[in-house]
């Protein structure tokens, strides 16, 4: 979408790592900060597709937490490049890279440099998320983060009392600037302290593959905020971007031309 990006993570010394670097370079993503750990296996996901629908996914990877020394190396690498950055997007996939120690380092860096911090959470980690700018859980993850059972469903999110309760609790407990809850075919809910929740209906016309939709949302939202959009404008752009990528088969991206056409 026109911004510069750097990838910070830990990979193995294997063919998957080589392929990852090749793909990142092809998309002009700076992969120089990637740290190689010969004791880890680079995550490789194999999706089995039948009649344009994903049937099952097989993951080959290492999921143990990275060593504290690697977390410090990652944080130092990010610190070096933050002078020219507007935001940090943190994707927690539960693969062992986003530890509490590393997340605390990132939060400290964000505060010191005054940059926006976005996180796509993985509730199973039970990390302390207080101090972030934005989190983008789906409905299931939001309820898990709040510790509330999701035993209701309402086709109109703003009338879903349990969902409203979860949103209010997460905003207060985590001291967030924005909470964006993705709701699948119901769109997304944007919540801010002191404001009423704002519901944005989905724009997806045909859904072939939801792989990467969450990444599209958090990436587009964060870029929009960094460029000066307000929280609702950013969410609307993210909603358009997600509507484009779910209409493609496989893990896909959205181009500026496609985004403009959707708008």
Regions found by a protein language model. Give the residues of each.
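Conserved phosphate/ATP/ADP-binding segment of small-molecule kinases
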Residues: 95-197
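Short acidic, glycine-rich surface-loop motifs adjacent to enzyme active sites
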Residues: 84-97
């Amino acid at each position: 979408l026109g911004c510069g990006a750097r990838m910070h993570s830990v990979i193995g010394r294997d063919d998957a790592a080589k392929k990852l670097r090749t793909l990142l370079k092809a998309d002009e993503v700076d992969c120089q900060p990637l740290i190689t750990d010969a004791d880890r296996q680079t995550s490789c996901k194999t999706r089995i597709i039948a009649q344009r629908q994903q049937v099952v996914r097989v993951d080959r990877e290492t999921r143990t937490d990275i060593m504290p020394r690697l977390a410090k190396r990652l944080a130092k690498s990010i610190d070096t490049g933050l002078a020219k950055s507007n935001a940090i997007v943190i994707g927690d996939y539960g693969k062992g890279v986003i530890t509490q120690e590393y997340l605390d380092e990132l939060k400290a860096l964000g505060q010191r440099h005054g940059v926006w911090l976005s996180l796509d959470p993985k509730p199973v980690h039970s990390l302390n998320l207080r101090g972030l700018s934005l989190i983008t859980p789906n409905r299931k993850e939001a309820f898990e983060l709040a510790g509330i059972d999701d035993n209701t469903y309402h086709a109109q999110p703003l009338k879903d009392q349990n969902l409203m309760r979860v949103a209010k609790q997460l905003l207060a407990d985590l001291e967030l600037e924005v909470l964006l809850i993705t709701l699948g075919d119901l769109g997304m809910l944007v919540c801010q302290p002191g404001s009423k929740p704002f519901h944005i209906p989905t724009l997806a016309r045909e859904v072939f593959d939801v792989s990467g939709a969450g990444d599209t949302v958090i990436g587009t939202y964060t870029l929009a905020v960094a460029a000066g959009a307000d929280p609702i404008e950013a969410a609307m752009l993210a909603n358009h971007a997600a509507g484009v990528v779910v209409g493609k088969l496989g893990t896909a991206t959205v181009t500026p031309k496609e985004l403009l056409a959707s708008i």
